[in-house]
């Protein structure tokens, strides 16, 4: 059955903007890791870029969820909750992962929606699984390391040793960010294709 998609809005440009800001953010972060001094102006720009990238990403999630609803997808998280769950303590450790899987499966052009729930039969994306594992590790790693230092479980270290400990988590976060860029680009492209199919 052909489904009209009057509420569909392309998110490809938003995805490309997010990717651009993430790349700039990573470059700033690498420069910060390699630098001996912290430039206050650079630090401010660094956080402005982060906030802009975060805001765009939240908008992307809102619109991506709204788009799959316009395709006829049923029994999915609402667009508003797709944003809110990122900020709810404890739940933010798995809800965004589930939402991303929902968007991925429902956006896939191979998922033909007749009753609206066929997306549930699609397999979970492995790239999303890896991305989320890396995201959680990069989030928890520095916290655990800082906590162990605070409790004197490991000695307070100098900057050189601290870099050795924290740099692996930075690298993990870069890999996770790269996977995130691939995920949102793929979903954005799929949704554009699906929108054309639904109105043809």
Report the location of each language-model feature.
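Hydrophobic, aromatic-rich membrane-embedded alpha-helical segments
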Residues: 79-101
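Generic detector of isolated residues embedded in canonical secondary-structure elements
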Residues: 63, 86-87, 183
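Residue-level marker of positions within ordered structural domains that often coincide
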Residues: 69, 92-93, 189
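Short leucine-rich amphipathic alpha-helices used at interfaces
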Residues: 38, 70-72, 88
